[in-house]
Amino acid sequence: MRIHYLLFTFLLVLLSPLAAFSQKINEPVSCIRNGGICQYRCIGLRHKIGTCGSPFKCCK
């Protein structure tokens, strides 16, 4: 029965940092802070990591 407690605490510690990455970027300041740039479309090797407003996307 003790193994269940150890397994639960291990999973809790392992999965808790993932909650921080579930928030979306939806403003230009947070886009720039996360190393992205605001463009109309993501061109080339850049991929969308959020939005900077209605028509613009945050690309990194």
From Swiss-Prot:
Belongs to the beta-defensin family. It comes from Mus musculus (Mouse). It comes from the Eukaryota. The gene is Defb8. PANTHER family: BETA-DEFENSIN (PTHR20515), DEFENSIN BETA 4A (PTHR20515:SF2). Most highly expressed in testis and heart. This is Beta-defensin 8. One of its GO terms (biological process) is defense response to bacterium. It is found in: Secreted. Its main location: secreted.
